[in-house]
């Protein structure tokens, strides 16, 4: 038979009636293909190859459509066969829609019918698959390699079978691919329910006309994201009606199709189907179990097709009205492509089925949602099972959570609804009144985990905490005005005595302070005032550990006494200690609460001690003669011992007169009294007070050791000195009587670059001065060291009288104990020794015979205090006026003071560089300047009625620090005008040659803390001592490890990923789906032939609105562990190292030891530093927690609702239409936060441009750790990310809110899912620029309630707090 001349015909198999037309077509198609393989008998392989291509294309076309028509997904589309689809370049379809009208009464214009013409693009797609036939199999199938044996015949059958299996696999891929492609097409045009449903409510005549409407819409979107996400998981157990309501909203929020088609999917009773709901198998099963009612289990599905006509170049007009297939004639002609003569051969059989309806009954789940009958379809198993293609309706949802750590609640919120609900151990204080340091929450498995301050060591115990160089460079580009230089300028004292220097300072004070300094105003502000948009100085509050201030530029500090007229600039100084954090950001209540915590189970002053010492500090009649005695003793142990009898009589007299203790303003005197007068020389009660006072100072010293981890010295200093500034030799006591602190300070080494100016010149020590050598008018750099008790040789080297611990205790006493009792009502004073020593020599002592006994009663004429001996201007008068009973023997001892005299009160200015714990290339040039008085005194309560004091006869004010700068004491300097006295009430009158506020170690916040505190003296001493703990990385590592609250809090940010199960709803006939002619391409290859099958597809939406919508219905599983893995910047970030190599190595070691993100092995020379891989994982991918330093006084309510971790709202969605508005919303703090208009921010250390948090997490600065890979904070701090997401949100609202207006046929409207709308169900935190609060608490008791299923009945208990879950996960984890 000559097959070359015979036309090829597709064999037509016998049609077997089976009651199901679709199944019949499928069976007949399979037989056709198999019969073709059986009939191949020829040597002409080319002929049969062409016949095979044609047959394969027809076969795939047929069964692809047949299988698809069995799916409920076919409800949503109109299938159209379009063989010429390959030739279409730019297809469009035109719709005409007539808008409905309402006839109205009244003076309304009469409406006319309106027609809208829409043009829509055809989107072209394709499906492809491939298989191969080996050369040997081709030979067997073609018969070229047959040898007539049974073996070759068997091999030929096996080859045909294998080919059939390959073709079946390809066919199966086209069947699955058709369903997958259409599902993705529907998803591409389906906006989330959380967007589509609110738009129907808030759209004003089809448009969002104003910013107000847009803001209202955004607020609603936020609410709907929280409520609608995972609605099935949340409510399927208890509130099933809410699930039904959400489903009804889903199927009713879409617009119907414009296709007026005769094809109708219906249930077995003939009710038309309105659409299809596609979801996962799990959600489908849960919906059918008690939530939705199954209306029917089968459906009548029409076998449909469409016809395409090409008219004009690149213009396609679709006849979208489906044509029902009435009989198998149409099946054969349009689906199998049979020739007419082949159809006539079966004419008799076909006529038997002419009356069969055009529908086929298939298995289906039909449910009623509201009043709409829909298919409920799950393609997960039918289409996607065992494939490597993910199911499109299983998605990912990224959520960012926020957890406040260490926030201190204001007094109004520190309450307990039932104080007895959580009671401490009997007899013990309630730890729930302490500032919180730990936060507890649940991980994905319901296990309780925690984060503490120690978890943040990897963030702040890093040298990036000290990197402010780039910040200075950036803010110096901005214009600044120097309103007041006082506090920001340091000079050396001018020539002359200290008294003259003080007078000159007050004469020129107004030049330095034309306005009120910023640092004094801030100390009196509330947190709301500091963070208000009207605070112009808020822009300089950028870092918790640095003060930024405007100062004179190009002036080397210390500068000239008269500040030069230069341009201003911005300077930065380390705050050094947490007590220097501004009071609004670290309030007095917090400091006192922390002090109370530290005082528990530690030494506390006896109430009698408190009363006696407090009374002395507040005694306005404190004997002036006591200050005279202090001055002549001037810290000399030798002189004290010589005057011991006189001192005893002074103490005893004052004790008996007032029941108060004398000399408590002088640490040296307290030490000597305890050492020499504590063995019965004084009344027992009085001795106990001095002893108790000293024990308290020593307890404060032990406090530092308790909060310091022992270790080897770093940079030549012990860790306790690196942890607390009072143990740092660089800081001198405010008053020194000898050179001991200076000598100990000199042992620090050159790294601290310490310098010392004594009266403006270099320092030099003098052993001691006797009366013959004294010069009260002496100036210069000489300091008297005091005469030692032993070894009196002026030629001997000058060595300290006491060990370094003496100086440490001295600083603790002056900086912690004295302010607690004085509350700012004390002042360091200069002494006029030129008048004191002559006064001492004026004592009148009656002559007594050799055999006479000295009288003890002042009534005796021989007693020195008898009225006949009270000569004016003598020392006797001072003792008499103070009612101090001294005898002759005691007064005779005063002659010993001339053997070791003081000449003057000398100002000392000491400077030092940062210690090894804070020294970097940036901070090494920053110097502190602290003033000290040598041979001065500390005067307690000012004696307004003492004439000698008012005239400045013996003492004059010389404040060295704001702690010792009572304005009332300026009355001892006659001649000051009223302006100076008034200014001193607002600004501490500390001369600029004693340092400046911003350059001092102890600054205004500490002084104001002592003044404003309402705590008792015990608590306040510990509170002040806590304020002197340093803010450097090494110091913080000690504090975190030992449980010390550092004075600031953290905002913890964590990002988790969840697998979601989504629901898609599509209206019936809402998509036109075109199928082109399948093409088979052969590619000869070595060893066989490759076949590539490609079929062009296209689709176009048939709606004038959104015809599909979807929602995240159920939570499948968390991918991440929702745990507590802290970030470690040593793994992700490179920055400036510490200057001291030992300090850098120490930090790396203590941070990385035990850290789960510690580096793996030694640091590689090349390549990336990777974390150590754990041996096992139990809870999933670890989610990293990042820490944003936050003021401890931040509004806790801010964290109870979704909020921006920066502390201020961001994103163009809040902005106006101006180009700069989006940037201003993020960074312009002169405007209120859009979410909280009364304040600019809740965290100035993170929300402002160039702030610490901004520099740490903003990818704009090209830091390798600030990336979306490592950092969950990246998306909130990087402006490009914020703007991109904000533009998505703005465009999303504009696109979705646009209505269909009357338009010409040239207008193209594509109702596709707006760009960025997927973020509503995939990444809402980036879209809204908000993180969600997670269920967390600082107290585990608040997470435990007596009722099953009830968590967090109370939101607070004293200082502890509970944050409720306000995220989309709320209600998804019942066990939590």
UniProtKB/Swiss-Prot annotation:
Location of the protein in the cell: Virion; Host nucleus
Subunit structure of this chain's protein: Homomultimer. Makes the hexons and eleven out of twelve pentons. Interacts with triplex proteins 1/TRX1 and 2/TRX2; adjacent capsomers are linked together in groups of three by triplexes, heterotrimeric complexes composed of one molecule of TRX1 and two molecules of TRX2. Interacts with scaffold protein; this interaction allows efficient MCP transport to the host nucleus. Interacts with capsid vertex component 2/CVC2. Interacts with the small capsomere-interacting protein/SCP.
Native source species: Equine herpesvirus 1 (strain V592) (EHV-1)
Primary location recorded for the protein, binned into one broad class: virion
Function noted in UniProt: Self-assembles to form an icosahedral capsid with a T=16 symmetry, about 200 nm in diameter, and consisting of 150 hexons and 12 pentons (total of 162 capsomers). Hexons form the edges and faces of the capsid and are each composed of six MCP molecules. In contrast, one penton is found at each of the 12 vertices. Eleven of the pentons are MCP pentamers, while the last vertex is occupied by the portal complex.
HAMAP family registered for this protein in UniProt: HSV_MCP
Name of this protein: Major capsid protein
GO CC field: host cell nucleus; T=16 icosahedral viral capsid
Keyword field: Capsid protein, Host nucleus, T=16 icosahedral capsid protein, Virion
Similarity annotation: Belongs to the herpesviridae major capsid protein family.
Transmembrane helix keyword on record: no
Chain coiled-coil ranges: none
GO molecular function terms listed in the Swiss-Prot or TrEMBL record: structural molecule activity
The keyword Transcription regulation appears for this protein: no
